Regions:
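Alpha-helical scaffolding segments of alpha/beta enzyme cores, especially the outer helices
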Residues: 10-14, 38, 87, 91
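Catalytic cores of alpha/beta
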Residues: 28-44
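Short, hinge-like loop/turn segments at secondary-structure boundaries
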Residues: 8, 41-43, 64-67
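Active-site mouth loops of central-metabolism enzymes
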Residues: 24-26, 78-79
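Alpha-helix-loop-beta-strand connector modules within alpha/beta enzyme cores
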Residues: 4-25
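Glycine-rich phosphate-binding active-site loops on the catalytic face of alpha/beta enzymes
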Residues: 42-59
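Active-site beta-loop-alpha junctions enriched in small/polar residues
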Residues: 26-30, 50-52
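Extended, intrinsically disordered, low-complexity segments
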Residues: 63-101
Length: 101
């Protein structure tokens, strides 16, 4: 992105009020934790979250390969990626749902 995303919170709230249906946020890359929370307060109920999680998995796989250059088992790399992705999703869920871990 060339600029930080700017969510139109009054519009989100108005759409939610007029339709009475839960809203879906497609593409949340670059959205701050505070803006996620505000969007949820205004009617967003589903957030398609992938890019940050995938990036964490990729970075973990790269780091694992760097630290273990002779690794021959894919599942070792996949486990490192999975663990990083799981950690990232847990952080996102704590923002989305206000969970304390």
């Amino acid at each position: 992105y060339t600029a930080k995303p700017k969510l139109d919170f009054p519009r989100i709230e108005k759409i939610h009020q007029l339709t009475g249906v839960p809203l879906v946020m497609h593409g949340g890359s670059g959205v701050s934790p505070e803006d996620y929370v505000e969007a949820i307060k205004r009617g967003v109920r589903k957030i398609n979250y992938y890019t940050y999680m995938a990036r964490e998995g990729t970075n973990a796989a790269k780091a694992y390969l760097k630290d273990h250059p002779d690794v021959i088992y894919y599942h070792d790399i996949a486990c490192a990626a999975r663990d990083a992705m799981k950690n990232d999703v847990e952080k996102a869920m704590s923002v989305f749902y206000g969970l304390k871990k």
